[in-house]
Amino acid sequence: MCNIIYNNVYQYNILKNIMSFVKEKNTPVMEQYLNLKAQYKDHLLFYRLGDFYELFFDDAIKAAKLLNIVLTKRGNSCGQEIPMCGVPAHSSESYLHKLIDLGFKVAICDQLETADEAKKRGYKSIVKRDVVRVVTPGTIIEDSLLEDKSNNYLASIVEQNDEYAISWLELSTGKFFHTLTSLKALDSDLLRISPRELLISEKFTEDEKIRSILKNYKISITQHAQSFFEYSKSHRTLCEFYKIRELGSIGNFSKVEIMACGALLEYVRVTQRGSIPRLEFPKTYKQQNFMLIDTSARRNLELFSTQFGEKKGSLISVIDHTVTASGGRLLKQMLASPLACSKAINLRLSTAQFFVNNHDSRRKIREILSNIPDIERSLSRLILGRGSPKDMNLLKIGLGKTLELSEFLCKIESGENGSLPQQYVIQTEIQPASRAGITVKSDESELSTIHKSLGNHKDLFELLNSAILDNNLSSVKEGGFIHSKYNSELSELSYILNNSNKLVTKLRESYRDLTGIAALKILHNNILGYYVEVSANHKITSDIFIHRQSLANSMRYTTNELKELENKILTARDAAIGLEMKIFSELCSEVAKESEKIALAANALAKLDIRTAFAELAVQNNYVKPIIDDSKEFNICSGRHPVVEVNDKFIANSINLAGIHLITGPNMAGKSTFLRQNALIAILAHMGSFVPAESAHIGVIDKIFSRVGATDNITAGYSTFMVEMIETATIVNQATDRSLVILDEIGRGTGVYDGLSIAQAVIEHIHNVNKCRAIFATHYHELTKVSKYLKNVKCFCVKIREWNGEVIFLHEVIEGIADESYGIHVAKLAGFPDSVLNRASEVFEELKA
């Protein structure tokens, strides 16, 4: 169980008397530091000094230990030496990464001028510095601090009058969502969204139930006063950010949703120090459009990680065949929120079917996609003012590949590369296209919709291609990333920089011709700069030569032309870098004009990546297209567990589930695997993926519930049995007639009669009240009697064979009731000594008698 990391728990003792420190005799630099630190008490302050970011006082003590760097001292304050440590500015991101992962917030203080510029303001003036940004777990945008295929959400939860809202955004991609929720659903929402940082009011955590929920997650918690979430303030923040008068023009918001969204935007404004990010209009997440997977099911089904916290062995590790970062992120969103609309699901399936049938098209598209960088995140950095030449170059490459992809899709639509998939379209799937000024007809295939959403970025690509050199430069201050031919002034400066020696030599030759002195030289030193030198025996009479210095054996001169050339050479680099920075800023403005269409194209690329990835998965793993409709069917022929079958020989099993299937059989026979595989097949189908089976017909499922395995929840103070009862209570209280429930044992943590009574009552309730599809595995053979009076309960068992005193598990699910649980045999497999096994057999026979 992971603990919450509260950012405000770090106390800065040195700042308790901050103002008295400032009044003490400190150096101007230390006074500047202390004044800035007083504004960011709950942050580690990275204070720029030359080529290093320095940390002082308690910050230094903490950082040195956490980052494993040397703790030293610098000067004195209040008669005590000041602890100090530092990290090189050029490699600071790796240190930031570690601190952010530990839940710290870091305030970045940069130099706003050079030392020479500071001296112009006065001899004793120090370099101006200020905090330029605040880096927190939920607001990072740097590639080196992010995982390519994982979202990095900042979320906010607000409660007012027992109404709850949660809003979440990702600064690195511009995604922004909000939804109404409830205290009961909050746990599931947090697990689905998986935010890195959560913004809440100080009052919010006074509720014991809230604290109990939050303890289950490794989330950086940022607390603010209730006024930070105030309605009128949040409403104003939203309107000002999107430059609108009424919020109704961008969506429907409840009062509490406005408070959650507005607080997020205000927090972004504070942390970004005035830089305006690119954020989409907040989209309403409507739970009724998606399958709800309860908290227990998300964990037990190992969708994203195993019970040991590893990605390998999870469902995502098997099904992720995406080749783009944005496709990988969208796949995780789809797995977290499968669809609950048959038409929308079939829209996805039809496109995947097309790529299953058309190998060459699938291969070509995946080849192009694999060479497309993460333009979504590069775009966000460029708009926020933190983009690098590398980001601009990646955007250029991405737009070029998008044009190539668009041309290939034109061939598909013209029939050159196969027939278009069945024409489905769902209006909610294409709303973003409408906002970007793209008209999408209601009778178009999804592939056509994706094609149109890619847009035409030829003009912008050609502009960037003519301006940007291929590079991996992380800072515009380095220069050397703009084509010299793009700008005539830059071309001249580049010529000077690249040919300075040639220009000096050319001028020297012209002076030799003018004076007739073959031994004339042009030399350079730090005192005179460039100068003309001749021996003392030669006399120069031309008026263009200005005497500079007389030596015993030589005479030195300069000329206006030489001074001008020297000035050009000395200033060319600074001028070139300054000009490149100006051009870069202009290019960023051009990118900003197209940002909405670029973001739409990035989303279309992600969708296309997933559809082709699903096709690749289906072909490689022998998956079949499921039939999805609005019936209540659950008929799977020869279904397989998508994860287990990858590494082991797998026995397929069928199921035709119309009510409740009660499954008996020994441990290790495969009951739990059978339960999980059917839930996973249902989830895959609702994502729009093919499934591991010979055939599958599934009526839309609104919710999936799981009670499979149980452990103590020590942090909440719950025993194994209590956890089991809470999970079961969730099922009987929330399951509908369109839900799928899988239960693996109920009542094991109490007395036999108690457990049996509870299990039977649950089955009867699910049958008579919930009326949902359910698979119930049990060791209580007495439960099978319910099939005699509950018409929709059928009994199944796992087939076993006894041979020469041994029990062989065949892993086949057949109709019927298991004779025994074979627990003693499993104990033998586990390595019990013979004496214990023999005694267990004796006791077993006595109990049977």
Curated annotation (Swiss-Prot):
Classification via SMART domains: MUTSac, MUTSd
Domain of life: Bacteria
Record-listed ATP binding positions: G665, P666, N667, M668, A669, G670, K671, S672
Entry's transmembrane regions: none
GO BP annotations, alphabetical order: mismatch repair
Entry keyword set: ATP-binding, DNA damage, DNA repair, DNA-binding, Nucleotide-binding
Single annotated GO MF: mismatched DNA binding
Name of a matching Pfam family: MutS_V
PROSITE patterns, per database record: DNA_MISMATCH_REPAIR_2 (PS00486)
Protein family: Belongs to the DNA mismatch repair MutS family.
Known function: This protein is involved in the repair of mismatches in DNA. It is possible that it carries out the mismatch recognition step. This protein has a weak ATPase activity.
Protein name per the record: DNA mismatch repair protein MutS
Organism expressing this protein natively: Wolbachia pipientis wMel
Gene: mutS
